[in-house]
């Protein structure tokens, strides 16, 4: 491979790496799927609690409101990023609280833990079987988008690591 080709390839990889780190990419491949998981969990809780368990019903609506708030933040960050505007808020409500505590990444990690816990609960409790067909397809879409994007980033990072080690070792 000639030097110009190598430089061109590096520029392409740098551009790809920047794309993976952009708020638009992060919002729509992580944030929005997480909002869908929360929303469907909350709706399922309200459905199960309706008329029989007021606490589960109220809890479900709180989760729905949380999901909608997070969705507004993620979509807004994605749009502002595409417009090259400042991003005056975090990806989710919990991280926004973390912003005021000067630890937004810690709170974002807590939100991630809670969301993965929701996914696990939906699976292990078999609540996932209570989703309507359109809700199930929405769940599948969110899962696919989230996992495929994570896999693409992992593959990309391994290629970059391999190239860096190959170049540094000769």
PLM regions and their residue ranges:
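Membrane-interfacial helical/loop segments at transmembrane boundaries in membrane proteins
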Residues: 43-55, 92, 127-134, 169-170
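Alpha-helical transmembrane segments and their membrane-interface junctions
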Residues: 31-41, 109-138
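Hydrophobic alpha-helical transmembrane segments of polytopic
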Residues: 63-66, 110, 114, 142-146
């Amino acid at each position: 491979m000639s030097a110009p080709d190598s430089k061109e390839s590096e520029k392409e990889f740098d551009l790809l790496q920047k794309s993976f780190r952009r708020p638009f990419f992060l919002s729509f491949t992580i944030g929005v799927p997480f909002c869908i998981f929360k929303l469907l969990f909350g709706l399922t809780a309200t459905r199960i609690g309706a008329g029989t368990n007021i606490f589960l019903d109220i809890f479900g609506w709180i989760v729905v409101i949380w999901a909608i708030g997070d969705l507004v933040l993620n979509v807004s960050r994605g749009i502002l990023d595409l417009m090259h505007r400042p991003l005056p808020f975090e990806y989710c409500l919990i991280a926004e609280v973390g912003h005021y505590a000067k630890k937004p990444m810690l709170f974002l990690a807590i939100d991630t833990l809670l969301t993965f816990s929701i996914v696990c609960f939906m699976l292990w409790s078999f609540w996932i079987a209570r989703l309507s067909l359109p809700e199930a397809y929405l769940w599948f879409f969110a899962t696919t988008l989230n996992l495929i994007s994570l896999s693409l980033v992992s593959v990309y990072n391994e290629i970059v690591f391999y190239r860096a080690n190959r170049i540094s070792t000769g």
